[in-house]
Amino acid sequence: MENTILHIHSFQLPQTEQPYPEAMLFDRDTSDSRTVLTQKPNGLEISLNFLQYDGHKGLFIRQDSRTNEPEYIEPKVLKPRNSYILFRNATSRCSQSIDPNSAFVSRVSSYIWGSGIPNPIVRRWFKYMGFFEALYHEVDYPEYIPNKLPKSPKKPKVQKGATKSKKKGAKGKNKVTALQVLVGPTVGVGGRMTVSPMTAFFSNNSHVTCYDPNFVLDTPTREFLMMPLDDITLPSQGPRSDSQEQHVPRQPPDGQDYFDILDIDDFVSPYDDLTTRSFTNRQLFKHATLG
């Protein structure tokens, strides 16, 4: 499963001036298309449709192949905190999605291993973020699911005159991170995980960083800012305090709606007033939240 991108979504999006369905995802290949997730009658699978979206009417547009006339479709809003795992092959454009609340979870393990992402890491993160209990009954190796993320390993003491070991890949070896994401000129595996409104995680097994859940991984080779897992703060639930400083992110370069290489100042707190602000699919957020 090369060139596979793993998406885990909670579908909690902010209120905007225009209707903004919770089930809407951005398709990274066409600027005016959206990936709509609709639940099948059996409640176990999700189907994918690529449709245009009319922001003024709040409806999706599907072109009728027989009459060539547009058909307006009202989006199905999924329940808050519903989470779905979507495996997408970037080469063949084929997609498969699985509801972790169903028995299909057992299949997820093989897909995760096949894409080079160690499933115990994903399971730990699911457990830590408090997702549905049904998920844990379906996975293999329940001993891999701790109640919380383990502490980072202590740094070994170095005696005077001794030289530190510089083994490649040793950094962050024992850390538990959201997903293993490999970004580089020859690597085609990417990942994204949303665990709460306006929060997403990327990880390369030793670092993790947060993005808006609408943010799309444009190419597997794009360079992203990575922050150590210890630098990610998990604030307690609740609204942002008025005494806290309001952070205003800088804007990307003229003519771009994204940053080529991200800077720490490109992140804002999710505790800004999400009900009155309008967000784009390129805005980023600094802190993880338990949602």
Swiss-Prot record:
<keyword id="KW-0804">Transcription</keyword>
<feature type="region of interest" description="Disordered">
    <location>
        <begin position="232"/>
        <end position="255"/>
    </location>
</feature>
<dbReference type="GO" id="GO:0005634">
    <property type="term" value="C:nucleus"/>
</dbReference>
<protein>
    <recommendedName>
        <fullName>Mating-type protein A2</fullName>
    </recommendedName>
</protein>
<keyword id="KW-0010">Activator</keyword>
<dbReference type="GO" id="GO:0003677">
    <property type="term" value="F:DNA binding"/>
</dbReference>
<comment type="similarity">
    <text>Belongs to the MATA2 family.</text>
</comment>
<feature type="DNA-binding region" description="HMG box">
    <location>
        <begin position="73"/>
        <end position="144"/>
    </location>
</feature>
<keyword id="KW-0805">Transcription regulation</keyword>
<comment type="function">
    <text>Mating type proteins are sequence specific DNA-binding proteins that act as master switches in yeast differentiation by controlling gene expression in a cell type-specific fashion. Transcriptional activator that induces the transcription of A cell-specific genes. Required for repression of conjugation in diploid cells.</text>
</comment>
<feature type="compositionally biased region" description="Basic residues">
    <location>
        <begin position="151"/>
        <end position="173"/>
    </location>
</feature>
<keyword id="KW-0238">DNA-binding</keyword>
<feature type="region of interest" description="Disordered">
    <location>
        <begin position="148"/>
        <end position="173"/>
    </location>
</feature>
<keyword id="KW-0539">Nucleus</keyword>
